[in-house]
Amino acid sequence: MITIALPKGALLSDSIALFKQIGLDFTAFLDSSNRQLQISDPTNTAKALLVRAQDVPVYVEYGQAQLGIVGYDVLLEKTPKVANLADLKFGACRMSVAVPAKSPYRSSIELPPNGRVASKFVHCAEDYFRRLDIPVEIIPLYGSVELGPITGMSDAIVDLVSTGRTLRENGLVEIDVLFESTARLIAHPLSYRLNLDHLDQWVNKLRQINLKPVA
């Protein structure tokens, strides 16, 4: 029996729909009365773990799950040792730099030297500004990062943006995009290489749903 790590939040519904297309039913996770964090498919072919998105690659890397679905942003932030198998083409968003609309900055390179940037994606933010050779202080925030520039604690933020509505409602504007992010299918490398629990069979079924393989 294979174990699949599914992410709580925005990607869950589409993830469950995807697996249902290949005969694995985890819709019980969508029941508002559900409190279980681990369930088995009715055919007893596979089980799924319901975990925080950031924890999906951890369960996969350590072999507690053979497959998982996670945003590309999490993979870049956490850099886990997992096999990135396919772009699932849902959950599209982007990692962006945003500043107050009234600020004079319209590009990352215009930010002041040693300026402050608030983000929950510390690694992604540090890597981005290092590549630009711009010295900034990254302030880790794990709640509403929009409050960083609103309160004057930071000059900018680095955060995921989908529609941009939250930014607009808080008087912020995007000035640069670090990368685009979508949901990805990941696997435990050794399990995938050895085809444990007929893992290849499930991956191939998923790939037949016109998924884009990752180079």
Swiss-Prot record:
Compartments (UniProt record): Cytoplasm
Entry domain remark: Lacks the C-terminal regulatory region which is replaced by HisZ.
Protein name: ATP phosphoribosyltransferase
Role, per record: Catalyzes the condensation of ATP and 5-phosphoribose 1-diphosphate to form N'-(5'-phosphoribosyl)-ATP (PR-ATP). Has a crucial role in the pathway because the rate of histidine biosynthesis seems to be controlled primarily by regulation of HisG enzymatic activity.
Protein family: Belongs to the ATP phosphoribosyltransferase family. Short subfamily.
Catalytic EC class: transferase
Main localization (coarse): cytoplasm
Its EC number(s): 2.4.2.17
UniProt keyword list: Amino-acid biosynthesis, ATP-binding, Cytoplasm, Glycosyltransferase, Histidine biosynthesis, Nucleotide-binding, Transferase
Lineage, opening ranks: Bacteria, Bacillati, Cyanobacteriota, Cyanophyceae, Oscillatoriophycideae
Catalytic activity: 1-(5-phospho-beta-D-ribosyl)-ATP + diphosphate = 5-phospho-alpha-D-ribose 1-diphosphate + ATP
Assembly and oligomerization: Heteromultimer composed of HisG and HisZ subunits.
